[in-house]
């Protein structure tokens, strides 16, 4: 889809579908302007549809003239409550109403209260991402028409300075959605590694994959313990973006890569949603999606390392037992008191490996705890870090992306819950504060001198019903936040 600005007036626009945002109680002037397009039928149509401009309301009017042939009005609510995310939601509604149109979609929104460039990028991303549909596994997908061009009406040319980032970023989100949505018999650890290799080949990145024997040589006992219950080989992925010219910052992204999580001998039952545990590699999807975007955007001065310890957590005669002791690659011994707390074990060795790269900052993303979902729900991810500048940078990046992120406490006193009578640590603490003790467990495997942040995306990785610009299913959460954060370091 081509994206461009249309600085001229609404009356001179001649596309196929016109979407206009309307404030509640402030519609009269705009409706009078639109009335000429509808040849007197607009007010009557809106009365029938009971459109008042409330947030989330939508009305459609078929026009008798050739261009445009469909008018879409989307309610924005009260003008004083206007935020960038309201534009995203309105644009997503308008885009979905344009399905069936293969021509030009025009959007007229109240740009002025907000930064024009930020608003243009937010709306363009919302349109592309809301039109996404995964048809890879359909035997006979139905034909589907979407707009081939998006014109943002009433914006000056200067507002287009960030539009070049839209398609690379959205392509990264769509890759993440595809990876998360793929069933576990399709997206195996080997398939995830192949995705990274293909990204490297197509986008000028570097990629290395460590096999089981390589990981054993590095004494990654925690990671390999999780993998030993599966017939599928683990794959430890290291993908690297190197900028042209001198490197000023070296950043590392670590993504949890459990392509399926049965829970192990602490088998997932009841409300544990074992049928959805294909999405337990959502962290790896986010960091690979971000790598895909960064490879095309090519920020200067920033080197980015993407690390994924991919495997399955399954049950067989070789699977790790509850109560087993393992040794991580930094020498820390761990008592596994719950085999369903496996993600932190794989991340432990991944974080130790990443520290060896001497990065200036590490950010890990993981579908780690149900406790985070209980605390923050399905629209906000949790952020744990002891480094204020890193927290501020990630929070600002998430806000600009429209992805919910909330900083959570990391009190050292909660580490008491991880003490073991046999080993240095247990892999789970008491049920209260479970997301905090999970973050504290990970902290044990990060060198104190390296700024580190942990983002728990257990609630945000998947949307059962769909919301805003996210379809039902995989959301691709985290890609846009990571891309914004990395580019801000350039």
From Swiss-Prot:
Cofactor: Mn(2+)
Superkingdom of origin organism: Bacteria
Residues involved in Mn(2+) 2 binding: 256, 261, 280, 342
Cofactor note: Binds 2 manganese ions per subunit.
Classification via CDD domains: Peptidase_M17
Catalytic reactions on record: Release of an N-terminal amino acid, Xaa-|-Yaa-, in which Xaa is preferably Leu, but may be other amino acids including Pro although not Arg or Lys, and Yaa may be Pro. Amino acid amides and methyl esters are also readily hydrolyzed, but rates on arylamides are exceedingly low; Release of an N-terminal amino acid, preferentially leucine, but not glutamic or aspartic acids
One MF term in the entry's GO annotations: manganese ion binding
EC number annotated for this UniProt entry: 3.4.11.1, 3.4.11.10
Subcellular compartments: Cytoplasm
Pfam families: Peptidase_M17, Peptidase_M17_N
Binding site for Mn(2+) 1: 261, 340, 342
Keywords: Aminopeptidase, Cytoplasm, Hydrolase, Manganese, Metal-binding, Protease
GO BP term, example: proteolysis
Keyword Cytoplasm: yes
Gene3D superfamilies in the record: Leucine Aminopeptidase, subunit E, domain 1, Zn peptidases
Active site: 268, 344
Enzyme class, UniProt record, top EC level: hydrolase
Coiled coil residues, start to end: none
One cellular component term from this protein's GO annotations in UniProt: cytoplasm
Role: Presumably involved in the processing and regular turnover of intracellular proteins. Catalyzes the removal of unsubstituted N-terminal amino acids from various peptides.
Family annotation (HAMAP family): Cytosol_peptidase_M17
Family assignment from sequence similarity: Belongs to the peptidase M17 family.
Name this polypeptide is given: Probable cytosol aminopeptidase
UniProt source species: Prochlorococcus marinus (strain MIT 9313)
Taxonomic classification: Bacteria, Bacillati, Cyanobacteriota, Cyanophyceae, Synechococcales
């Amino acid at each position: 889809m081509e994206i461009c600005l249309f600085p001229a007036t609404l009356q001179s626009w001649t596309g196929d579908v016109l979407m206009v945002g309307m404030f509640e109680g402030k519609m009269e002037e705009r409706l009078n302007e639109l009335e000429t397009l509808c040849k007197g039928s607009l007010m009557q149509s809106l009365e029938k549809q009971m459109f008042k401009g409330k947030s989330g309301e939508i009305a459609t009017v078929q026009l008798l003239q050739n261009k445009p042939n469909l008018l879409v009005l989307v309610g924005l609510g009260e003008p004083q409550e206007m935020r960038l995310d309201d534009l995203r939601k309105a644009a997503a509604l308008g885009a979905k109403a344009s399905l069936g149109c293969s021509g030009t979609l025009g959007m007229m929104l109240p740009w002025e209260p907000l930064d024009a460039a930020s608003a243009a990028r937010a709306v363009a991303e919302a349109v592309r991402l809301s039109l996404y549909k995964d048809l890879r596994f359909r035997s006979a997908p139905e034909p589907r028409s979407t707009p081939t061009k998006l014109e943002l009406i009433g914006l000056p040319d200067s507002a287009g300075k960030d539009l070049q980032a839209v398609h690379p970023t959205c392509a990264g989100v769509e890759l993440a959605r595809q990876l998360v949505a793929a069933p576990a018999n399709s997206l195996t650890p080997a398939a995830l590694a192949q995705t990274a290799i293909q990204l490297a080949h197509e986008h000028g990145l570097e990629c290395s994959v460590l096999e089981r024997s390589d990981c054993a040589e590095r004494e990654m006992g925690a990671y390999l313990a999780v993998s030993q219950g599966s017939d599928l080989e683990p794959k430890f992925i290291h993908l690297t973006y190197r900028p042209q010219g001198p490197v000023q910052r070296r950043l590392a992204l670590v993504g949890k890569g459990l392509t399926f999580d049965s829970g192990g001998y602490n088998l997932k039952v009841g409300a544990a949603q074992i049928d959805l545990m294909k999405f337990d590699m959502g962290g790896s999807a986010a960091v690979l999606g971000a790598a895909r975007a960064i490879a095309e955007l090519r920020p200067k001065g920033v080197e980015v390392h993407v690390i994924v310890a991919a495997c399955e957590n399954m049950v067989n005669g070789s699977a790790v037992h509850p109560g087993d002791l393992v040794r991580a690659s930094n020498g820390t011994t761990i008592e596994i008191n719950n085999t369903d707390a496996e993600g932190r074990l794989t991340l432990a060795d991944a974080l130790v490996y990443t520290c060896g790269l001497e990065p200036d900052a590490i950010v890990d993303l993981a579908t780690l705890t149900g406790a985070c979902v209980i605390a923050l729900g399905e629209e906000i991810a949790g952020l744990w870090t002891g480094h204020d500048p890193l927290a501020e940078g990630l929070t600002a990046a998430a806000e600009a992306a429209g992805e919910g992120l909330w900083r959570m406490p990391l009190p050292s006193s909660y580490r008491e819950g991880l003490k073991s009578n046999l080993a240095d640590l247990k892999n789970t603490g008491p049920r209260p504060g479970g997301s905090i003790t999970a973050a504290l467990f990970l902290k044990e495997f990060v060198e104190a001198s390296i700024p580190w942040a942990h983002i728990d995306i257990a609630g945000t990785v998947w949307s059962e019903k769909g919301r805003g610009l996210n379809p039902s299913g995989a959301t691709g959460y985290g890609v846009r936040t990571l891309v914004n954060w990395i580019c801000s370091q350039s």
